[in-house]
């Protein structure tokens, strides 16, 4: 059984927002697009986000994820030098301009893959981590499945056009979000504006993401282009707001007509998201949303909430129309561990449900002794 009670907050809501009340996004000239408020964990705008599309070099987001995972597991290190195979050297498309006579540090190869979008650097990393490109692709698909990217299939590590090498805007949002969350220590690569490996053409050094040069709040992530995919960009920005702090948005535009178009449409989406929606902090990180009674435990109550702040994206001017309902397991019987889901915060705008936030035990509660459990069992029976 769940016990619930209502709380009118005068602030809150977000966006999966009731369609009748959601702000209408600007006209976006892209095959498919998506705007996500990462801070509030809400979709603000979307078009055809489950349609299969060519990935182009957005593929390198997954390659990067696996390289960072290998670094975390200490299978490789940043200063380790990897060989450049003939296969890597002969990769077509964007290049870092490395060759088989070189041994290149992982740190430089990551820069070559992300900043220059080098297919040669990407192949060298894939072979270094996976042993072979084919084995690395297996790892890519296994990781996609683990992340819940149900519309994605990888055929290569760099993103060149190949039958069945497909993804969706929704899956890219999942990957980008997890990339930023799981590996914050490596996100500086995506905001670096220029890089050239010593002895290679300096004209090749500018980051393909032109928003980095236009908007100081943009700090990533990755461009892509092939004839089949069109011009694509997964971009992210963070801006500061009173009472909320840093608010991060993620835009995905796929299948635009030019480099300039992908930057313009991404900028349009980001600016619209920051102005059409307000961010409202409902609860601080670690703050008790409610303190329900505990049965058969060494403690009589437990605080439930979230380790991170609970923030909601609200259509501008709509905060006063929001209500929340808090529910929890009833009876709430020990034992349970810190971080275990024991309730939910339901947010509504008017009569329409907007978002459900799982509420976790902020502390664990051990089971009481025999006498304590027996006493509570009798009380529950009477109840």
Q: Model features per residue range: what roles?
A:
Residues 16-22, 360:
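Bacterial Sec-dependent signal peptides at the C-terminal "C-region" and cleavage site
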Residues 20-184:
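Active-site-adjacent loops and short helices of periplasmic peptidoglycan-processing enzymes
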Residues 4-15:
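Bacterial N-terminal signal peptides
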Residues 150-153, 161-166, 170-383:
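Domain-terminus/edge residues, biased toward the C-terminal soluble/receptor-binding domains
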Residues 4, 20-22, 307:
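Positively charged, low-complexity intrinsically disordered regions
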């Amino acid at each position: 059984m769940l016990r619930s009670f209502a709380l009118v907050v005068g602030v809150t809501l977000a966006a999966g927002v009731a369609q009748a009340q959601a702000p209408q996004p600007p006209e976006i000239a892209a095959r498919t697009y998506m705007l996500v408020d990462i801070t509030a964990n809400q979709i603000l705008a979307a078009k055809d986000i489950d349609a299969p599309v060519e990935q182009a070099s957005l593929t390198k987001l997954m390659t990067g994820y696996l390289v960072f995972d290998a670094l975390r597991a200490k299978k490789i290190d940043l200063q380790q030098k990897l060989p450049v195979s003939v296969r890597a050297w002969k990769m077509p498309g964007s290049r870092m301009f490395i060759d088989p006579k070189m041994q290149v540090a992982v740190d430089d190869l990551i820069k070559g893959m992300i900043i220059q979008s080098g297919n040669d650097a990407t192949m060298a990393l894939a072979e270094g981590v996976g042993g072979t490109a084919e084995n690395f692709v297996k790892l890519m698909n296994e990781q996609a499945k683990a992340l819940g990217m149900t519309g994605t299939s990888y055929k290569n590590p760099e993103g060149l056009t190949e039958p069945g090498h497909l993804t969706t805007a929704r899956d890219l949002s999942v990957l980008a979000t997890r990339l930023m969350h799981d590996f914050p220590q490596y996100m500086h690569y995506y905001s670096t504006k220029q890089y050239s490996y010593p002895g290679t053409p300096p004209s090749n050094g500018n980051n393909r993401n032109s928003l980095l040069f236009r908007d100081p709040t943009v700090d990533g992530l990755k461009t892509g282009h092939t004839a089949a995919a069109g011009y694509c960009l997964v971009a992210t920005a963070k801006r500061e707001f009173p009472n909320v702090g840093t608010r991060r948005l993620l835009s995905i535009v796929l299948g635009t007509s030019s480099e300039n178009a992908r930057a313009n449409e991404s900028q349009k989406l980001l600016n619209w998201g920051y102005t059409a929606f307000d961010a409202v902090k409902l609860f601080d990180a670690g703050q008790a949303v409610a303190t329900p009674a505990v049965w058969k435990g060494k403690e009589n109550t437990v605080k439930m909430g979230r380790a991170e702040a609970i923030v909601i994206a609200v259509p501008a001017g709509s905060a006063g129309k929001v209500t929340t309902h808090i529910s929890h397991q009833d009876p709430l019987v020990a034992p349970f561990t810190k971080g275990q889901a024991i309730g939910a915060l339901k947010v509504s705008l008017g009569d329409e449900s907007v978002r459900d936030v799982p509420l976790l035990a902020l502390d664990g509660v051990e089971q009481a002794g025999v006498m304590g459990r027996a006493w509570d069992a009798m009380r529950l029976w009477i109840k």
